């Protein structure tokens, strides 16, 4: 019921678009990205690897044979260990040990045709896409030499604090907002409010249940 209430509130209070960035002007090139929901907790963002500026995302090199790259952000233990009540409570109380996780895939239908995912396509302007890329690039934590901290294939140490008020869904919404989309990240603590906002300016490629 709480999530239903949040969805009702955000319907009346969503931010407008940043008009210099979104929507793309008529005739302007667009960069399609994909908001991919993994169920009750997690949402990530996917892009074409060929659209990613060279050297911007270290994880791009981990999946050199894939056509698409999905990336998400979250609490280290919550991502990399079996989720327990204790781990969830610790993360929601506030965790500075955060990570980025990337995964490669070769065709959007791989996600669309799976009952595990809900997928929404969002078309960005070149400028908006560049700002989204910077949002993700700036989330990578760096070592003392200025290099990304790789924890394994697709895994990287991240910046930012995960909490009940700043989740993986909030992080994804912040990227969309930086790209100019009409979304209010503060409402996007869980997937429902995030997808409810995105579906108003994106195109659902797979029917979503009650978002």
Residue ranges and their predicted role:
Residues 1-4:
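Bacterial N-terminal signal peptides that target proteins for export
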Residues 16, 138-211:
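Activation targets extended, charge/polar-rich intrinsically disordered C-terminal tails
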Residues 19-39, 49-157:
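Non-catalytic ligand/cofactor/substrate-binding and regulatory segments of enzyme domains
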Residues 43-46:
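Short beta-strand scaffold segments in enzyme catalytic cores
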Residues 11-13:
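C-terminal motif of bacterial Sec signal peptides marking the signal peptidase cleavage site
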Residues 7-8:
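Residue-level signal for mature regions of secreted extracellular proteins and peptides
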